[in-house]
Curated annotation (Swiss-Prot):
Belongs to the natriuretic peptide family. PROSITE patterns: NATRIURETIC_PEPTIDE. One of its GO terms (biological process) is receptor guanylyl cyclase signaling pathway. This is Natriuretic peptides A. It is found in: Secreted. Keywords: Disulfide bond, Hormone, Secreted, Signal, Vasoactive. Pfam families: ANP.
Length: 140
């Protein structure tokens, strides 16, 4: 093909691409009826939530949490895992150096980041995500 023919084919292809409706954006795919129905459903859910909030505000008896004695025993879960966890008193202030919080932070941090001392946390995190770095080959 010559230059003029390739230019005209390219131009026609570009024109066809521009004229097709965009399928990547979901807004173009929604019809007004479907959009209206979804907005009405959202409005109904919001009205239900506001009615529930107003009912809770008008009846203070519904807001009070039940104590352990008021909860029926069939609704409570007496598993061994809950018994093994230490119970904290509600009036106990939690400090940064509390051993319970230290254990929770230790569980939260991945083992690689806890035991790492190679380059620092940021580099170790990048190394663990990419498989490169000093901790990339070690398996936990």
């Amino acid at each position: 093909m010559d230059t003029r023919g390739s230019f005209s084919c390219g131009f026609l292809l570009l024109l066809l691409i521009q004229l097709q409706p965009s399928r990547a954006n979901p807004i173009y795919n929604l019809s007004p009826a479907k959009e209206l129905a979804s907005m009405e459903a959202l409005l109904e859910r919001l009205e239900d939530k506001f009615a529930l909030i107003e009912a809770l505000e008008s009846n203070p008896d519904l807001q009070e949490p039940q104590t352990q004695e008021e909860i029926p025993p069939e609704l409570t879960d007496d598993s061994d895992e809950q018994k093994a966890e230490p119970k904290l008193a509600s009036n106990t202030p939690l400090s940064y150096r509390n051993p319970f919080l230290k254990r929770l932070r230790g569980v939260q941090m991945p083992r690689m980041m806890r035991d790492s001392g190679c380059f620092g946390r940021r580099i170790d995190r990048i190394g663990s995500l990419s498989g490169m770095g000093c901790n990339g080959s070690r398996k936990n």
